[in-house]
Amino acid sequence: MSKHKHEWTESVANSGPASILSYCASSILMTVTNKFVVNLDNFNMNFVMLFVQSLVCTVTLCILRIVGVANFRSLNRTDVKNWFPISLLLVLMIYTSLKSLQYLAVPIYTIFKNLTIILIAYGEVLFFGGKVTSMELTSFIMMVLSSVVATWGDQQAIAIKASSLEDLDQELVESTIFVLNPGYLWMFTNCISSALFVLIMRKRIRLTNFKDYDTMFYNNVLALPLLLVFSFIMEDWSTKNLSVNLSADSLAAMVISGLMSVGISYCSGWCVRVTSSTTYSMVGALNKLPIALAGLVFFDAPKNFLSFFSIFLGFLSGLLYAVAKQKKIQQQKVLAATLEK
């Protein structure tokens, strides 16, 4: 009985679909919790929130280790030296994402964020070998196209609202914003740091033979000093601002979001380990679709043909990518069987 239970546990632990579903569920929960925290009145200390999340995650892991549920490597100089660049990239990725959203509209942000998928796909070719099939590339293009269509829908809604301002030269304003808006520079940095984070983490996992809990522990514990330093440099630590941001409600919400981060930290490392970094990134992009649908239903988001069509394109690109991956796996199995003969 225990043997069958052990085999079943091992099967789930190495299951791609199980890791993807768990990652999707945990990331949706994490998104909802984070949205609640940052929407608190006058909340402006994002790095403190991320610090609390990492701290709660680290403490939770230590407790799980004491009770015998989790097992991970203790901190040592070699692993810290090897993993520190990944933690630095993680902090850079989070910060540039926040700065991009500060200057860019969400649809524009999504367009450039989805370009990261293509960067990762070709980065995998350089790091790990293999190739990107034409079907995979088509799915990537469709994903970006869905974001472009969403932007058109958003701009269409804005144009209708601003139709009364007939004397305003919209093309001149938009072209000026594109040239002067620093959000595009932040977004470019975010795409590069996001791709490097996923690719280097996967390579380090292979080289160090890190397990899921090892990845989870090192990602969080090494991020703690970085997040605190970034917070001291970039955020307002005045007594007045601290009293607003560190109220009982905000602290409770941050602790809850930290517990949610335990799930997303574990599932992120699990998904990268048993699938691929491109699959992990693609799943992350597709995971925005339920939130997009919720935005159409519950929030003040554009509700027009282009908005719904962009969501349809997003799901279609996900299906195409899944088919492309299955075909590639089948071809690899056939090739391996041929070589064995």
Curated annotation (Swiss-Prot):
Q: Where are the transmembrane segments?
A: 12-32, 47-67, 86-106, 108-128, 140-160, 177-197, 215-235, 252-272, 279-299, 304-324
Q: Does the keyword Nucleotide-binding apply?
A: no
Origin: domain of life:
Eukaryota
Q: Which InterPro entries match?
A: TPT_transporter
Topology in the lipid bilayer is annotated as: Multi-pass membrane protein
Keyword Transmembrane helix in annotation: yes
List of glycosylated residues: 241, 245
Q: Summarize the protein's role.
A: Involved in the import of GDP-mannose from the cytoplasm into the Golgi lumen.
List the NCBIfam families hit by this protein, alphabetically: nst
The protein in question is named Probable GDP-mannose transporter 2
